[in-house]
Amino acid sequence: MMSLGEILFIYRARLRERTVAVQELLAVLGIAVGVALLFASQVASTSLDGSVRQLSKQLVGTMQYQLDARGPEGVSERVVGEAHSLPGVRAALPLLEQEASVIGPDGRASVDLIGADPRFASIGGPLLRHFNARQLAFFQQAIALPAPIAAAIGAGPPLVQSSTLEHTGSRAARSSRRGPTSRPIELQIGAHVVRTVLGTTLQEADIGALVHSQVALAPVAYAQQVGGMTGRVTRVFVQVRPGREAQVRAGLARLAATWHLNLEPADFDATLFAAASTPAQQSEGLFSVISAIVGFLFAFNAMLLTVPERRRMIEAMRRRGATRTMTVQALMFDALVIGVLACVLGLLVGEVLSIEAFHSQPGYLSFAFPVGSQRVVTWPTVALAVGAGLLAAFVGVLAPLRDILARPLRFSAAAERAPRGWTLFRLAAGTVCLAITTLILIFQPQAAAVGSFTLIAAMLALLPFLFDGIVAGFKRLQRHFHAASTVLALEELQDPLTRVRSLAVAATGAIAVFGSVAISGAQDNLQNGLNRTAYEWNHVTDLWVSPSGVDNTLATTPFPASVAAKLTQLPGLRSVGIYRGSFLDVGDRRVWVIAPPRDSAELIPPGQLSVGNMTQASTRLRGHGWAVVSEAIAHELHLHIGESFTLPSPYPTKFRLAGLSTNGGWPPGVIVINAQDYARAWGSDAASALNIDLAAGVALAEGRTQVIRALGPRSGLAVQTAGERESQWKSVSREGLSRLTQIATLVLIAAILAMAGVMASLIWQRRERIAYIKRQGFTRGLLWRALCFESAVLLLAGCSIGALFGVYGQLLLSHALTTVTGFPLVIGVGPLIALTSVAVVSVAALAIVAVPGYLAVRVRATMVKPA
């Protein structure tokens, strides 16, 4: 056993040689790239639901139950008194929640308007606890906004800050009688636009990370007033006395049945969001697993390049009488230093990447949930990235241990040359792994993570054979150049002494491009499917009229159907149909209910029906009591076509299943019925949108202008053509896929950095060999061109192999996304993505390594043959 001082002495002695120090730094860089990629991708997959969980926790506080209205019209607030009168209930507090937009001088923002009872300030969660009774009295006719939202709409800082109001309460109240102290803004709820004031902004000191949530707060009475919901609430939160839970739950269940409400735990929104975000989390998790594999292999391949140098260190220690234990100690200390440095650097780089890349929120879920933009970094995420980095360092450093166990030591080419049995094993293993991947693709695509692992294993096992084929092709091609530089490059590529390092470089390129092509290609297929969905759902009519704002892209905000009467008499319109829709909680899912007019051209687009006869399903939907349901929902309810089920709408109604569909781009799923059946089940004739078909010969612009004039300048309704609405859908879906896009981008960036680092390390190791070759009189320019040719062949070989397997990975991931998430994909092969990835990674890495290549050929010639 060696002491720590002796180990440090050996380590410092090794680092005195500049070549060794540079190799160690490049190995640190290679592992750091892998750690950064793994950390940033894991942050992406864990951040999505953090804001909703935090908001739910801070809002409900110690409440145990909630009575939740099933429709946007809410329920009479009389239910609050009935709930409070139940034996065992300590408190029953009303809450009014509505989709809204706040409009300021610089723009608008979508928010979840929360009208809270003043008593929430004392017994609710931290979100409302910083308001005391005096503050709530002061802001009876105002709203509160998180500071980032107020700044975004140009409302600026209020004249009275929430953090200072507590100290100035009575003075501010007195001064408010003498003149206005708040900033005027506008609030749009449905088609209704009202003027209000920004009474306070919520700072991070008040509500912590929730300052990034899309919420607006107001007293419940004021929220009822501005929202046209006088006497109505959407939720009732209940606090139970100790030991009375069973009694209270039974009483609340009877009350819920009477009023047609949902009885759920107080924090049930977090459960609903978990179900809503599961498909996105699954797809992001799948992509993150691929990224993790890619990142780990980046790190491992970076360490492979240092194996020859460590083999020489082992040989030197053995000659000086070092025991096996001493050698292992030195190697493990080396691995620990590299691993720790790489993990620290990787976490720092990953933190920067995740901050810069993951700053936007997935807007498609913010239509039904107050999703924030904050990042959530957990200890398991850090531990996973650090563990993978340390593992790569230890495996890479300890790889030479096989030489320690050999007696005698094997040197040079003998150590580099693989036995014939190992070659046959690689060929058989690659073929078997490829067969397993194919079976997973055909029979079990939801096991795509396993399939991706076996596909990468097949690629790495078969890579030496494919690499030899590409080098043989280069050999035939270079004969036409008659250039010394290509001859030198070919000799290096075929040299058995450098084969392991050459294969490590090619493998790094293959892994890099594989990850980029597979992830980007699958994401492109998903985006194409969502684009088709946007076209099919929106091009059923000429014009759409609905409450303005991106938050109403799915047309789920109600407004009076009487608006249609204003438009039916316009000369340029052929028909005006009432479209209805909203979100409805079905079990643990917040599903999207779509209810087009019965006479709509297409009640269910052909591309959305996955099981069933299109003609029969359309005919049934035009009748009474039929519905098309997403496959995931139908499987949960154990439904088959033709069977009946009760829809838990405000007025529970029986429907029969006409067919099964995709999720329509809404992760929890969709239910399609006609607008008349919707009005019956919801007990409301309110519209969510108007479908307008123009008369023959009327241009879109002319018809749109007529409708806008008829609605009037103060209307909160927007008039869009089918094309404009389609573009809005596509924009929102791209935002929803931003995490996947960011993960794909990170993989590509990491690929370039990893390839550049590995190539630079390889070139630096060649300095002694270049110095020995220069004795033959070769010029710097010739040697630099030879290095560039060699690097180009290595890069193109590895990247081309990765692109080939990446296209297969794209098909595997695409089928997995369809099966697991229910998204409407357009599955195809994207050769352009593969070619682009090969070109970007190869050109960028080659441009980067050109500099160290030029520096390497400046070494002085020597007669000493390298070891």
Give the predicted meaning of each segment.
Residues 14, 21-23, 33-62, 77, ...:
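Alpha-helical transmembrane segments
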Residues 2-296, 305-308, 363-364, 534-539, ...:
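Membrane transport/envelope proteins' first extracytoplasmic loop
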Residues 111-171, 532, 539, 552, ...:
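Short beta-strand boundary microenvironments
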Residues 1-30, 249-257, 279-282, 286, ...:
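Alpha-helical transmembrane segments, especially those used as permease/efflux helices
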Residues 61-74, 453, 459-616, 631, ...:
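Juxtamembrane segments of multi-pass membrane proteins
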Residues 300-303, 337-368, 380-406, 432-444, ...:
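Small-residue-rich transmembrane alpha-helices
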Residues 20-46, 278-315, 336-350, 388-395, ...:
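Hydrophobic alpha-helical transmembrane segments of multi-pass inner-membrane transport and secretion
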